Amino acid sequence: IIEVGAGYSSALMLDCNQHYFNNEIEFTFIEPYPKRLKGLLAAGDSTKHRILEKKVQQVEVQEFEKLEAGDILFIDSSHVLKTGSDLYYLFFQVLPRLKKGVVIHIHDIFYPFEYPKEWAMHGRNWNELYFLHALLVNNHKLSILYFTDYIAQVHTNELDKCPLLKKSRGGSIWLKIENSNG
């Protein structure tokens, strides 16, 4: 798993790796300010996993080309697409080079591809999900595996099976590369 933007989600993944996967999953965390991440690491985590203390734009694209089918690129970055930004690099340099079968998680994506009203009212002027929506329209290279907010809003009866998700349904989308240029 390569995670762009590290923090509490990193800790959750590391815990799941320990409890359910016998610590067999290797992580690369790309985080220019890893103080929080380092504080969350358990003894031994730093020897098994890598932390690249730099902006994702400074990471060679070849790092992402190492991902194989079933591997995960987990994106929780600035959420803003603009000149020279992390998202610009990820969407235009990294995603087109990913191999068939690579799974992509993008955090803070809501259905129907609109941010919560409260976020806009409090100055979260993100634009990531608008660009993602445009990218997905008529795109046969990417398929949607799971869209948490869509399930929560459209298939509410399914959430009855998972009552904790009703409290905090989150906002993320899981995609899969179906055809590859890389």
Pin down the residues of each PLM region.
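Conserved class I S-adenosyl-L-methionine
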Residues: I1-G7
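Structural motif
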Residues: I2, I72-F74, V103-H105
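Catalytic metal-binding/acid-base residues of hydrolase active sites
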Residues: G7, Y33, S78, F110
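Conserved SAM-binding loop of SAM-dependent methyltransferases across substrates and taxa
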Residues: Y8-Y20
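Short beta-strand element of Class I
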Residues: N22-T28
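S-adenosyl-L-methionine
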Residues: I30-F74
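C-terminal substrate-binding/active-site "lid" region of AdoMet-derived donor-dependent transferases
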Residues: K66, H79-N179
